């Protein structure tokens, strides 16, 4: 594995800020020099009546965690683009994954070890399944009864199955469709060696139609000498509701969805 450490940045109102929200983000946003204790007091005050509570929905949890000004700058519109669902109807667990730090640590994760497969995920997966006891079948439709490894045949044979697809599809939508989000990617090529200077750039403002952009070469700085110094590839992510036949990425998981299944 490489020694890659994941860091994310966000644009808001013409400026670039470090994520997750940390003391650097707070001081830059408020043009201040708060100490950790001062920043904690500030955020608690800006959380208002939600301070010290444990809200169940994303909107209130976001305000409780980082105060209303930071929530409206970095989370509200980004969430609107990503989910197209009123934040008050989304579970708080979505934003609980985003840490808030009252220091200058801008690592996205707190794991002891981080890294990416040195030869890429394809080589990594190929090694994992390189065993005579493992057979990989591609292009198989689990729900097509004309194919050997289909749901009906495997169930009749009593074969244990770990199904990782949409649960509503598994039950043939007999209880209705769940809401899922999917992502469309737009590839953009730039005639420059590095466009963002980081692997992931979030776009927090509503006037930018995509949620974030990924610049792949920045995931592998150890390959810098072998990369094209005059070209770079960026993928912009556009989030929308998934329809049947789309690849679902995220369950919306509203109370209505949870009540179905």
Name each model-derived stretch:
Residues 20-21:
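Short linear motifs in exposed loops
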Residues 1-4:
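Conserved FAD-binding subdomain of flavin-dependent enzymes
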Residues 9, 71-74, 78, 83, ...:
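Aromatic side chains
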Residues 6-7, 15, 24-159:
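Active-site/ligand-binding neighborhood in enzyme catalytic cores
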Residues 140-261:
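Mid-domain catalytic core of redox enzymes
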